[in-house]
Amino acid sequence: MFTFNRLVDFQEFDPLCHFMSQRYRYSNNEFRTKGSLMYPKQAKPVSAKTLVIDLLSTMPARHPVPVGALVRAAALFGIGENSMRVALARLRSSASIESDTRGFYRLSRKAQPVNRKVRSWPTLEQGVCDWDGSYLAVETSGLPRRDRRAAKVRDRALRLLGFERLSPALMVRPNNLVGGATTCRERLVELGFAPTPVLFQLNDLDPKLEQRARNLWATADLEARYAETRANLERSTARLPERSLDEAMAESFQIGGEAVRQLVLDPLLPKEIIDTAARSAVVEVMRQYDRVGREAWKQWAGASVELERSPVDMGTLDSVPSEVPGLASR
């Protein structure tokens, strides 16, 4: 499915920030349309810029896409050719995408660290291990704050790996990621955290602080979203065979995007804190939905191209990372 490779430009177009605050709700099953797209009444229509990034991110690594194919896909969502060409020009100018051959585009190299993070959703649970009760902690008091862009990137990196603030100078998450502190530190750096974080294992919290740490994540909200997302995927899977090809492409793009966003931003909490079986169920249903989505988009991609995942909408947004679903309000 589509990934949020739109992390590419941190100034004019900040796709990861857009990605992280998108919160579509499908509970009332009410949809409206634009072009062939069916999307929830609360959701925003797809923009030309984000559609370009989403489409390019589904292709095999470094595989270029002709502008004609992008224009055809845009028509499904009521986006005109001129709008797409303007979006392509702006994204290329901001180094979000690149082109070696006239009329063919692919994601830039700057997008790859986050793209790898998103591609991992089908196997995300392979990245967790049993929890020994300790936490990974990042000390933040010495970090420079004058560079707001760098500070935003650090915040996003921490949120992507499930960290939450335990105290004014301490971000924590359960120590249940494979590789422990060393691997987590490397992943933060790969996601743009600079300078290298002061990251360490935190043990033996007093009972009061331990309870406070466990309550940093809104687990009831997360579990409710697991159930809702699974139900949405199952309903859409049942509907898609009755849709036209264009409608199936558009619906799988929207519904799948919500599920992938949720999985990529999941804090991957251990079973001692959250219902991990419910999370696993969403991953499994999404794997099945991805196969359906790929089939719908096969004709668009062409017989010679094996999509890495079916295109899905990763959203457009302007909010800060604290909008990530499942974080306890403070």
Question: Can you say where each PLM-predicted feature lies in the sequence?
Answer:
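A short, conserved structural fragment
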Residues: 92-102
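Short, hydrophobic-biased segments on the C-terminal half of alpha helices
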Residues: 85-89, 97, 155
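C-terminal regulatory/effector modules of DNA-binding transcriptional regulators
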Residues: 210-330
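Mid-protein regulatory/catalytic core that forms ligand/cofactor-binding pockets
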Residues: 143-239
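Short alpha-helical segments that sit at the start of domains
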Residues: 18-55
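Short, amphipathic alpha-helical interaction segments positioned at domain boundaries
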Residues: 114-135
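Minor-groove-contacting beta-hairpin "wing" of winged helix-turn-helix DNA-binding domains
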Residues: 103-108
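Short acidic, hydrophobic short linear motifs in intrinsically disordered regions
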Residues: 63-73
